[in-house]
Design a protein with these regions (language model features):
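Alpha-helical cap/lid subdomain in secreted, periplasmic
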Residues: 22, 81-211
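Sec-dependent N-terminal signal peptides
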Residues: 6-11
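Solvent-exposed, flexible loop/coil residues
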Residues: 53, 73, 81
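Serine-esterase "nucleophile elbow" of acetyl-processing enzymes
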Residues: 20-68, 84-96
Length: 211
């Protein structure tokens, strides 16, 4: 919980330091399901992190406009026209928080990008076009997946086997060490941020420490 609060605190400090006086500033969020608005009816507990961001700000001065959508990659978000809709709303002094990676890893051609080439190029596009509109881009890498599964030993007790699953035909059991699944997709945003002199928040590390 401490690390999760640090994530929001980092955003608050970063955004408040440059807010324009006497004018409502909008914080746009673009990304995937980890940030997206969720259905909260009937006691559903799942939340995208951007759903909670407005609580950090006085809506009389700063408004969060969350455009993150389940299943989107840096590629499909552009190709579906979602980025154009955000871009036309950006005014000078607004912020755009950019967070992709989980779905860029997927094999489907309408979503897949490669770190170091197409993934980086899409992130740079978001940054460049935000700045052209007078906005301030904030780049984040993807949060970690809750992946604690390791290859099952040949002999395991019944309790461990109750939590077993199969991945690529290999029996896996739940372990106590978080397994990285993001690889270069978590590193690419760091490189792009340095290259473009863009604000960067290491959400992957923050959520890794939280786990």
């Amino acid at each position: 919980m401490k690390q999760f609060k640090l994530l929001f605190a980092s955003l608050v400090v970063l955004l408040l330091t440059s807010a324009i006086p006497d004018k409502r500033t909008t914080i746009f969020v673009i990304g995937d399901s980890t940030a997206a608005n969720k259905d909260t009816t009937n006691g559903k507990k799942e939340r995208g992190w951007a759903m909670m961001l407005q609580r950090c700000f006085d809506a009389n001065y700063i408004v969060v406009d969350n455009h993150a959508v389940n299943g989107r990659s840096s590629k499909s978000f552009i190709n579906e026209g979602r980025w154009d809709k955000v871009l036309e709303k950006i005014k000078p002094g607004d912020y755009v928080i950019i967070q992709f990676g989980h779905n860029d890893e997927k094999a489907q051609p309408d979503r897949h990008t490669d770190p170091g080439t197409t993934f980086d190029a899409n992130l740079e596009k978001y940054i460049s076009e935000t700045r052209q509109r007078g906005g301030i881009p904030v780049l984040m890498n993807c949060v970690v997946r809750r992946n604690f599964f390791v290859k099952a030993p040949e002999i395991a007790d019944d309790e461990l086997l109750r939590t077993s699953t199969f991945k690529d035909g290999v029996k896996m059991i739940e372990g106590d060490t978080l397994i990285d699944t993001n690889g270069l997709y978590k590193e690419a945003p760091k490189h792009v941020a340095r290259k473009t002199n863009c604000h960067f928040i290491d959400a992957n590390k923050i959520t890794h420490d939280l786990e």
